[in-house]
């Protein structure tokens, strides 16, 4: 009996996980012992190379989010060690964005020539080296250099992971980018919470960040061998200037990240000034925004498959505009918190969908196209706070934020052409 059962299971054990478009199909084994066949299928699927590679790609997004989330709790400590005024701190924080923007075009070219794995490892190494320095340095010039290099590392790994995610999405023939970016959001939230918990328990900033760096480095070294060793394009392909479509998508990403930056930098100030919400709890608006953004990304692939990219972009843009109107114009706190929740939900799938859009165009290499839209998008986070502050000085904060929300009309009006063109 054992020999017979074993012989019937051999085809299942030998079968490749994704052969003939099916997972572990063996009718005879299933009829002979369905329970054992199920156990073998589960065990093999966990060990299957495709399963491991998929989770390795997902880990890259998680680690990138963890890196960014680890820096946020360090900001007030860096300010106090260096004795910085608010204006000096603002200039210091700009170094992160400039480092990212300068590194992204180079990362796009390196991804094409050296591969996603190479760029991910370089970016991860820079991140792991700079985070401990950001937790200990007290000189403004040294902090500026370290933060710029940290931004360069994060910008590089951002380009590589999006190119890699694009290739995986192409290979599987179904939407996957939103889920990948959901893990980025989850990594940022979990890392910030872990750092906050360690600091609350009395750990020094260096010890707290060392724990996070150890996690990042350990996971990076474990899954690096499973990352894609090449880029999405032919390394011998000539350099191509950004096409009109790529530039327009970049501008739309600029608007999306400007909106995200507005919620990050101005939501607490607005709630405190206009609704008299205490600053100690006004930051809850951004927490609600972040949670709904993560939830929207985890459901985004499912929605995109059923609704299509065009409807997802149109619906997302409308949700953001309605959310801004609720958050800014309505007085009861449940309603304006619901507004911030709608903003996060509407904005959640914008960047992942645009990554897929530029990956499908043929006017320039996908790696460079993603670097272009990411670089232009980062300008929204860099310039956004200053632009909103200037507009608030001229017309008022309420009106300035309403104008930011209205900018999402550009996404609604161009969605069909961008997603289909």
Residue locations for each model-derived region?
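Short amphipathic helix-loop junctions that connect adjacent transmembrane helices
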Residues: 73-86, 265-280
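Interfacial helix-cap and linker-helix signal at transmembrane-aqueous boundaries
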Residues: 78-79, 110-111, 197-202, 271-272, ...
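Short hydrophobic/small-residue motifs within alpha-helical transmembrane segments
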Residues: 97-98, 185-186, 290-291, 378-379
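Helix-to-loop junctions at the C-terminal end of transmembrane segments
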Residues: 103-115, 296-308, 392
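Primarily marks hydrophobic transmembrane alpha-helices of the MFS/SLC 12-helix fold
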Residues: 117-120, 313
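C-terminal ends and interior cores of transmembrane alpha-helices
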Residues: 125-138, 320-331
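Intracellular juxtamembrane helix-capping segments at the cytosolic ends
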Residues: 156-169, 349-362
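Symmetry-related core transmembrane helices of the 12-TM Major Facilitator Superfamily/SLC fold
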Residues: 206-223, 401-416
């Amino acid at each position: 009996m054992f020999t017979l059962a074993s012989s019937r299971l051999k085809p299942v054990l030998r079968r490749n996980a994704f052969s003939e478009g099916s997972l572990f199909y063996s009718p005879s084994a299933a009829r002979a012992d369905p329970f054992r066949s199920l156990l073998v299928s589960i065990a093999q699927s966990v060990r299957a190379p495709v399963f491991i590679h998929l989770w390795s790609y997902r880990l890259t997004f998680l680690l990138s989010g963890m890196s960014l989330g680890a820096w946020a709790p360090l900001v007030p400590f860096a300010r106090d060690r260096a004795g910085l005024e608010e204006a000096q701190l603002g200039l210091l924080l700009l170094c992160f964005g400039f480092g990212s923007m300068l590194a992204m075009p180079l990362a796009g070219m390196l991804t094409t020539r050296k591969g996603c794995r190479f760029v991910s490892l370089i970016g991860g190494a820079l991140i792991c080296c700079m985070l401990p320095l950001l937790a200990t340095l007290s000189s403004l010039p040294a902090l500026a250099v370290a933060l710029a290099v940290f931004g360069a590392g994060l910008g590089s790994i951002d380009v590589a992971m999006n190119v890699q995610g694009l290739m995986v999405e192409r290979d599987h023939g179904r939407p996957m980018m939103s889920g990948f970016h959901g893990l980025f959001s989850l990594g940022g939230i979990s890392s910030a919470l872990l750092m906050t918990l360690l600091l609350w328990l009395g750990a020094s900033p260096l010890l707290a960040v060392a724990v996070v760096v150890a996690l990042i480095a350990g996971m990076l070294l474990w899954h690096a061998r499973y990352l894609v060793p090449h880029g999405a394009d032919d390394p011998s392909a000539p350099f191509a200037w950004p096409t009109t479509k790529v530039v327009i998508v970049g501008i739309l990403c600029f608007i999306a990240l400007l909106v995200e930056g507005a919620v990050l930098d101005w939501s607490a100030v607005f709630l405190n000034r206009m609704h008299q919400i205490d600053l100690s709890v006004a930051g809850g608006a951004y927490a609600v925004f972040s949670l709904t953004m993560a939830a929207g990304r985890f459901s985004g692939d499912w929605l995109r498959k059923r609704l299509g990219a065009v409807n997802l972009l149109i619906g997302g843009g409308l949700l953001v505009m309605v959310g801004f109107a609720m958050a800014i114009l309505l007085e009861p706190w449940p309603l304006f918190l619901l507004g911030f929740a709608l903003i996060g939900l509407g904005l959640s799938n914008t960047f992942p969908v645009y990554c897929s859009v530029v990956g499908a165009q043929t006017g320039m290499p996908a790696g460079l196209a993603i670097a272009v839209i990411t670089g232009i998008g980062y300008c929204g986070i860099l310039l956004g706070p200053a632009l909103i502050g200037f507009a608030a000085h001229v017309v008022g904060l309420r009106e300035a934020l309403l104008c930011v929300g209205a900018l999402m009309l550009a996404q609604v009006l161009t969605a069909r052409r961008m997603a289909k063109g």
